[in-house]
Amino acid sequence: MEKIIEESKQGESLVLENKPENTKKLFIESYGCAMNFSDSEVVASILSDGGYNTTSVLEEADLVLVNTCSIRDKAEQTIRKRLEKYNAVKRTNPKMKVGVLGCMAERLKSQFLEEEKIVDLVVGPDAYKDLPNLLAEVEEGRDAINVILSKEETYGDISPVRLMSNGITALVSITRGCDNMCTFCVVPFTRGRERSREPQSIMAEIQDLWSKGFKEITLLGQNVDSYLWYGGGLKKDFVNASEMQKATAVDFDQLLEMVAVGFPKMRIRFSTSNPQDMHESILHVMAKYPNICKHIHLPVQSGSNRILKEMNRLHSREEYMALIDKIRAIVPDASISQDMIAGFPTETEQDHQDTMSLMEYVKYNFGYMYSYSERPGTLAGRKMKDDVEEETKARRLQEIVDLQQKHAWFRSEEFVGKTVEVLVEKVSKKSKDEFSGRNSQSITVVFPKENYKIGDFVNVKITSCTSGTLKGEAVGLSSMN
């Protein structure tokens, strides 16, 4: 659940710069979290070397891949509908091959290949380098599957091919997997245990992005704050590392500082943070460097200590609130966003009110809110009865959404009259005469184009707002240019 999901990007097909020598066409769609979109860029890079150019036209594809999400039942149902669409096209183009990547691949491998026979290959999140071999199997008329989870794989040696439509912002994966066995979450089972990527490969990827004109990167992982490089391997095995490995290990605040110092004119974001792993040292690094964005995505899921324990969250309500207090003290201009689940098994009205009161305490800038969706294979799915009525879940979720909307207005109004630095990302959807970008706090800002261009850092004085957007007038370029 702890993933930033951009609803506007769901199902976006990845179209990249083509190589003239490539003769085959790849159609790849992504669903779910930012990690899936990042992984699709890795996959496109691997297949580009194997003779594939990307296309946005499904009907002309030789190979169709969908990068899948298992976090909610709704996500899986959406992907199943897409698979039906792919197979309808395949009936008129029988040479087309269809494959499933990502979390559903690991979870439903046998069902897809053997029982329903709706795909030709199934590839888990740690097996993308094996795609050329798996495609060779498919060409020989055999089903192909690799969902083995790795202790080492981070794709640190793959240079992802980037989306050509923006060229300003990019995702940089730094960790894979998760060790926090939350009872509602499939991630540890579909993406494996935590392991971190070698720092120099991260720095090299960012250097490559900088040389190509990118202005902002997001350091990405299921749990970025627990980043720990000690020479490779699972984080849980760090206790067995040598004294030299322990002495030279790099943790997240050290990595964050390395990137901030190495690329002072590049904006740096990171996601996602887990409350128990966000230490004060990280906050001090954020406060020290102006190019580190002042936004923290800090999922809590519930404000009830009893429900947090049922979820196997490794923090209490009080510990979370104390962390919020630290953030406000050390990084006072930071925005904070949340993930929240309504209607977790056994949740009472008092548990729900505890969530509402926590939200009142924090007053989040924005959030990602869901009603509980039982996921097969999770501890909650195996051991807990989904006993909260759907009608009750829906009501509680709406109350959470309504309260978040109120707080978003409150936080947006705090910016009115202030001048904020905005990285121009695109032309506004609502007006071709306006630019749209985000400020350091990850809030969308819209302002008249004038003579500015995409990729500029512009100081904008905020004159009005909605709950999700700030509006203003440009007052000049910022010192980040």
Swiss-Prot record:
Annotated positions binding [4Fe-4S] cluster 1: 33, 69, 103
Residue ranges constituting the Radical SAM core domain according to the UniProt record: 164-411
Entries under SUPFAM superfamilies matching the protein: Radical SAM enzymes
Cofactor note text: Binds 2 [4Fe-4S] clusters. One cluster is coordinated with 3 cysteines and an exchangeable S-adenosyl-L-methionine.
Annotated localization: Cytoplasm
Reactions performed catalytically: N(6)-dimethylallyladenosine(37) in tRNA + (sulfur carrier)-SH + AH2 + 2 S-adenosyl-L-methionine = 2-methylsulfanyl-N(6)-dimethylallyladenosine(37) in tRNA + (sulfur carrier)-H + 5'-deoxyadenosine + L-methionine + A + S-adenosyl-L-homocysteine + 2 H(+)
Family of the protein in this entry: Belongs to the methylthiotransferase family. MiaB subfamily.
Protein's UniProt name: tRNA-2-methylthio-N(6)-dimethylallyladenosine synthase
Organism (species): Flavobacterium johnsoniae (strain ATCC 17061 / DSM 2064 / JCM 8514 / BCRC 14874 / CCUG 350202 / NBRC 14942 / NCIMB 11054 / UW101) (Cytophaga johnsonae)
Record gene name: miaB
